[in-house]
Amino acid sequence: MTVYKVVEASTVTDEALERIINEWVAKGWAFDGVQFAMRESSKRPAMAFVLFTRAAQDE
């Protein structure tokens, strides 16, 4: 079974996204993608949701 992790980022810069991706990949999660939430009044995203996956741990 696949387990999903969603990390919310309210600061959407390349440095912030790189930090989040590197942090969670180092913890054993596989990067799966990014979804951006846009503001109507701006071309820059208001926030980002960084998606990760990994195989479920047997309990």
Q: Can you say where each PLM-predicted feature lies in the sequence?
A:
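Terminus-proximal functional modules
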Residues: 1-59
